[in-house]
Amino acid sequence: MKPTAETAGAETELAVRGLEKRFGDEFDLPGVDFEVGADEIVALLGPSGCGKTTILRCIAGVETPDAGEIVVGDDLVQSADTSKPPEKRDVGMVYQNYAVWPHKTVYENVVFPLKHADHDVPRGEYERHVEEVLELVEIRELKNSPATDLSGGQQQRTALARSLVHDPDLLLMDEPLSNLDRGLRKNMRYELQRLHHELDVSLLYVTHDQEEAFYLADRVLIMNDGEIVERGRPRQLYDRPASPFTRRFVGERNRFRGTVEETPDGDRVVRTPVVDFRLETVDYVDDDGGDGDVVCFVRPADVSVGRFGHGGPGVLELDGTVVAEGLLGEHYEVTVSFGDASLVVHTKSGREFDRGDEIPLYFRPEDIQVYGAPDE
């Protein structure tokens, strides 16, 4: 497992401390702290408007924070007394819209940082550096092409080459794949991983796409309303989300409320509108150990439908009515109603269900997670 900057002894490439930014009377960032380690990919993941891009712009030097410190490598680039311009910061940046100049060729776009940024590349070496980075992103043959002739994927690679040409130790990426179609996004995720491993560059990646963040990142920082509400490795955040917001935002989960009661035999049982079950049999419990309200989660993929269900000891069985259904890529999504409650089910079966069908469902209590309700 790769060490991270927020573990003891790890080398840090980026440190953000107490970062604040106001727009008018409102805080966009009320005080943000995090680190990115050397050769680490960290994703800032959150909904639109949560402050992700503002953080990136402050690090790049195109936005001035109201308070806080930013350290890139060993260089203090932002503080109460210091504010270095973008060209004096050892960072590369890829914008969401790529910012490829339409009146320039690919070469002229990519060479720009060498002409204007703070680096040690002699003028006579510019062309070699550009050709090397174009080869790296696999568009060397487009070197003299006008930017207006480029496809979306080629523009993205041009912007990536421009961000890498001066060999930065830190690369900032702001929703770089959001304008590409699904096939290109998948290919570029692979390309970004390849480049990261070849160049040993640290990467701070902003996205609202959970799939991108979890595929690429060593660590993910979950943001909401200008704050980092949770941080951790992708598997940890997916399997054991600690904050109420993360549980709602990450992955797909059925969510239903219940009440914990103690039986005469001393067992703690959860009563819900969907199904009742013993608390000791579930996958994960985070409550105060007493009776009271709880919130329960089960993933759509963990619920089996119809004859494809697997009954047996301890399996929870229930019947409901199909209220919505449809094919979503590689699986069917079926919404099943139980009076005032419902469950969303994902099945790979070729069977299609019609609205109004009565169908049985099965799932194991080991697939349920239970959390205390007050913070939900």
Residue ranges and their predicted role:
Residues 2-31, 35-38, 61, 80-84, ...:
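A short, flexible loop at the N-terminus of ABC-type nucleotide-binding domains that lies
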Residues 15, 35, 71, 352, ...:
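ABC ATPase nucleotide-binding domain
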Residues 42, 53-62:
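Short, conserved post-Walker A segment of ABC-type ATPase nucleotide-binding domains
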Residues 43, 60, 83-85, 89-99, ...:
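ABC nucleotide-binding domain signature
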Residues 92, 96, 100, 105-248:
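ABC ATPase nucleotide-binding domains
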